[in-house]
Amino acid sequence: MKLIFERSRPGRGNGLLPSLDVPAAPLPEKYRRKTAPRLPELGESDLSRHYQALARRAFGVCDGFYPLGSCTMKYNPKLGEEAAALPGFTGLHPLQPAHTVQGAQAVLNRTEHLLCEITGMDAVTLQPAAGAHGEFLGLLLIKAYHHSRGDTGRTVILVPDSAHGTNPASAAMAGFTVKNIPSTPEGLVDLEALRAACGPDTAGLMLTNPQHRGALRERHPGAHRPRPRRRGPRLLRRGQPQRHHGGGPAGRHGLRRVPPQPPQDLRHPPRPAAARAAVRWGASRFWPPSCPVPPCVATAESTPSARCGPSTPTSWWSSRPWAYLLRLGNTGVAEAAHTAVLNANYLKRKLEEAGYTAAFPGLCMHEFVLTLEELKKETGVSALDVAKAMLDAGIHPPTMYFPLIVHEALMFEPTETESPETLDEAAAVLAEILRRAKEEPEALHAAPASTPVGRPDETAAARRPVVRYAFPED
């Protein structure tokens, strides 16, 4: 299909600006562009068709089953969209006086209170805008904590070898050196290796729990002191906090930092590709002095004070999880967590019965990992081939080749919003793909056959990305 710039024609715009309702003020010369921006110019019908064509090439939760592991691609209740669309949120300006945004600040304050209740933390900040952003914030807080004590020699962050690639990247960006901690054959952090890695230069540990293999470490490293007499916070990357509800808040596990992701795990907004949604950070009581400002605190009259500071997009994002949590209540949130775990174990068992091999045996939490290593050796069919074949059946592929400690990995996360019938249909599709892999492997090498886009050159896209349109006159 044509790019939007290729459809553009000079003067064919459809913008209608409202009449000016404030005194006109000239823009200072230093802020003016020297040349006009090269924006696409299309009629509204062409513009609408262009984006409809793009939508047909995409796959969303409303199009079908979306078991993308570690991303929690659950269905979004429309109630959250109504809450986020209220003028009191969408019409806010960052520089409005605090007394004019008391309603939005009340939502922020109440959202923080609910998240503290869920996580067991003493304080929450709503500042981060994305998952890796949240990691980065946590690492900066770790650095600020050590520096506040005059301890500037702690420059090493411990990261499990099964961690998200964003973990070491965030640590490096925050100025730390990364030291990898190996996993046990069960896919859990090797505590002996962790003890050996700890030293006077250790700043902290980044840990995902449940871990990406789908297992819950019931006792966190540090709860049984793998780092005796050594100071170092634990940064728990709790990607799916609702999976823990009813199982004990993080604050009771000795954790000091935890980033729940309400818009993602409790209620996430639509997002392109697999981009993370906004992350909220929780901290135990000795962290708040280092937390980002402005905090949203309540006065004795139970109304948010002016300390909330300028309004930010946080209020718009926070209205979604706030509405979601209020709608579910304590019982509903716990039921959602239990259903997510039940769905993952149900689908895992169905796929094992169909002939697939789980990377790690036993019960899982919210997600699980298959290994297709033996299938590839026997038939030449890879995890990529199976994932592409799922697209022909109207199912979005799971996460591929992650975690890195599992060869030919497929990570499934069915989420709690999927029905048993959907899981049965997905299991049947994957059973048929397995049969085809053994009987007609060449057909799977060519999958998908029915989608608008087949197999793009992902290596070239990663190494030579084209992120800017090449205008003919350039």
Language-model features: locations:
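Glycine- and other small-residue-rich loops at beta-strand/loop junctions that grip anionic moieties
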Residues: 69, 127, 160, 208-212, ...
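Non-catalytic terminal extensions of PLP-dependent enzymes
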Residues: 1-123, 308, 325-474
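A short, small-residue-rich loop immediately preceding and capping a beta-strand
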Residues: 122-128, 156-159
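Short strand-loop junctions, especially beta-strand C-caps/beta-turns
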Residues: 129, 184, 208-210, 371-375, ...
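Conserved phosphate/anionic-ligand binding catalytic regions in large, soluble enzymes, centered on
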Residues: 59-79, 127-135, 263-280, 313-317, ...
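Mobile "lid/hinge" segments at catalytic clefts and subdomain interfaces of large enzymes
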Residues: 275-348
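Conserved PLP-enzyme active-site core in the AAT-like
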Residues: 103-106, 133-303, 342, 355, ...
